[in-house]
Amino acid sequence: MSEEVFSKSVEQISYIMKGQSIVDDVYDYILATIKEGISEKELRDLIEKKMMKFGAEKTSFPTIVAFGSNAAEPHHEPSNRKLNNGEFVLIDMGVIIGGMCSDFTRTFAFGCVAKEDKKIYNIVRRVQALGIKKCKPNMKARALDKIVRDEITKRGYGEYFIHSTGHGVGTEIHEYPFIRKDSEDMLLKDMVVTVEPGIYIEGKVGVRIEDMIIVGTNKRISKHKTKLIIVKR
């Protein structure tokens, strides 16, 4: 299949943006209502219920919710663990609108978190911003992965970045191009891709920030910024 097939039309991009708008509204709702004692499963169920209420056709993948050290597993399956004050909450979610997927991850603090955790968060934040800035049409996907990976390594956390930098999003949640170190894929104008660096320290902490961008624009599709949010109840 030709690479150009994975560049998105104006209509396809509009569906992706509409889906992200729903996800943004769900995220706003969660930030406004989350309370200590809710379980990961309960929060996942609430998120998916709100997605449908706000107009989603369905979820684009099983929603990930991880509290505290559980977030050190990138594809954690929500459990009965309850939310405690002073830990991170990681949410990875997306919906389908018009047959097009969306994909979005944020990590926020529920109460005050440790200084080291904030440091890790801000490294991921800065590295993601660099990745978005450096994403250009007609570059190799692996070149973007190297930029992101090298920056995390330079900051002392390279061994804790244990997945790829990103992937294409469209009719499939994971599609061409794949932004990883062994990729031969090309980034072309109007492709929709994720930039999603993370740092995962087993048994301690996990942070991921993920946004979809349109190649050639260097802008997040989501309205949400990435400065650390601290929710206090």
Where do the PLM segments sit?
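Active-site neighborhoods and metal-handling regions in enzymes and metal-associated proteins
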Residues: 1-233
